[in-house]
Regions:
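P-loop NTP-binding catalytic core
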Residues: 26-27, 31-139
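Walker A (P-loop) phosphate-binding loop of P-loop NTPases
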Residues: 147
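Conserved P-loop NTPase
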Residues: 274-364
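Phosphate-interacting basic helix/loop segments used at nucleotide- and nucleic-acid interfaces
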Residues: 1-21, 72
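Conserved lysine of the Walker
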Residues: 150
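Switch/coupling sub-region of P-loop NTPases
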Residues: 129, 134-143, 156-282
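Terminal-proximal interaction/regulatory segments of ATP-powered molecular machines
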Residues: 354-397
Length: 397
């Protein structure tokens, strides 16, 4: 029996147990709303008729997260026992229609990079490019606006991290699911933990601790505050960092990094190697889809112009709904960083693009063979690497 099936959440049980429901939201007194994988936003026929019943339910729900909710601490961000993420706002003093909450359900099998390709969030070549970059220790921010699928895409990329690596994940609420055996999962502890004053453990604290744990990669659920300075310090000392970030473009990302409350010195920003911009976009049919709008390499900071240089590697064309490798032949990371790390001679550095093509072909073959499950894909990619398929001729794949 799965953990999810052992959790009794009363009126919410049918929604929790339905694998096609992604989100559950209650805006106050009234019906429960859901986000369905097929039918999208729907209003249910059940809910609450008065604030007292709703408040009592919310109190019990918060108790299941071990973060009790009170008038003094009326907002809780936490995780249910099955791993689902929940946000609760308590009482009519703050939420005028009555207590409200939103549950983002945890998935038993996270979405794999091949599933993202099926959804047309990205394509094989983009995935192959990210694979070679992440495998070779590049730092990356998955950036976009709310509900753009940043965490889902970042999690899918963890299959590109070498299987022998030690990974530390740091989050406010645990969402990332890493397939590696050597994985240290850490979660911050703030107000509402029920342990009294002085018991807080922040993202900043966890990041500082992570640097002493000798990780090969550090994954941060989201960088939004002073922990950003520690993350960039980690990058500067050779610890690759992968994280999500709220910004709709590279320019806005840099503005946020250099402004309050993160305050990264401009000369530090290029320690970040890659910025992937992802968004939820509306197609002509009216369907909302998620697309990686661009993948960008941060090249450097020019002190004379006070500007940043970045090169767009991939670009999404909204007219054709396809992706273009705009940076082919001009990648700073591939030619000047990764090719050197792989021991490719100067006069043969153009061959690094052949390596990207080879990996794209491997992903396509794995897709056709049916390895779309997150964990199945990870184990198969581990097997591929152990058998040396990355070094053989592409025609033999």
């Amino acid at each position: 029996m799965m953990v999810r099936d052992k959790i009794d959440v009363g009126i919410l049980n049918p929604f929790i147990n339905d694998p096609y429901i992604e989100d559950i939201s209650v805006d106050g007194v009234g019906p429960i709303f859901i986000e369905h994988k097929i039918f999208k936003g729907l209003k249910s026929v059940v809910g609450w008729d008065n604030t007292d019943e709703l408040d009592n339910f919310v109190i019990k729900l918060a108790e299941r997260t071990k973060r009790p909710i009170t008038y003094r601490n009326p907002i809780v961000d936490a995780t249910l026992p099955d791993g689902s993420r929940i946000n609760i706002v308590y009482s009519t003093d703050i939420s005028r229609k009555g207590s409200n909450f939103t549950i983002r359900k945890a998935m038993d099998d996270p979405i794999s990079i091949l599933k993202l390709i099926e959804f047309k969030t990205c394509d094989y070549t983009m995935a192959a490019y990210l694979w070679i970059c992440i495998e070779n220790g590049m730092s990356l921010f998955m950036s976009g606006e709310t509900a753009s699928g940043k965490t889902t895409s970042l999690n899918a990329m963890t299959t590109f991290i070498p299987p022998e690596n030690k990974i530390v994940t740091i989050e406010d609420t645990p969402e990332l699911q890493v397939p590696h055996k050597n994985w240290c999962r850490e979660v911050s502890k703030g107000k509402g933990s029920g342990e009294g004053e002085g018991s807080d453990v922040t993202m900043f604290d966890l990041l500082k601790a992570a640097l002493r744990q000798r990780p090969n990669q550090i994954l941060v659920g989201e960088i939004r505050g002073v922990e950003g300075a520690v993350a960039f310090g980690a990058m500067q000392t050779g610890h690759p960092v992968l994280s999500t970030f709220h910004a709709a473009s590279v320019e806005k990302l840099i503005q946020r990094l250099c402004g309050d409350p993160i305050n990264i010195p401009k000369t530090y920003v290029d320690n970040l190697n890659l910025v992937v911009i992802q968004s939820a976009v509306k197609r002509p049919s009216g369907e909302m889809v998620r697309r990686m709008l661009s993948i960008n390499e941060l090249v450097g900071f020019n002190p004379e112009t006070q500007g940043f240089s970045f090169v767009e590697m991939f670009h999404w064309d909204p007219v054709t709904d396809t992706f273009e490798f705009t940076g082919k032949g001009s990648s700073f990371l591939l030619e000047n960083r990764i090719a050197t790390m792989l021991g490719i001679p100067e006069h043969k550095k153009a061959g690094i693009y052949f390596e990207v093509e080879k990996r794209a072909r491997i992903l396509e073959r794995l897709h056709k063979a049916g390895y779309t499950s997150f964990y199945d894909l990870y184990h198969m990619m581990t097997k591929v690497k152990k058998q040396g398929l990355l070094t053989i001729d592409i025609d033999a794949i």
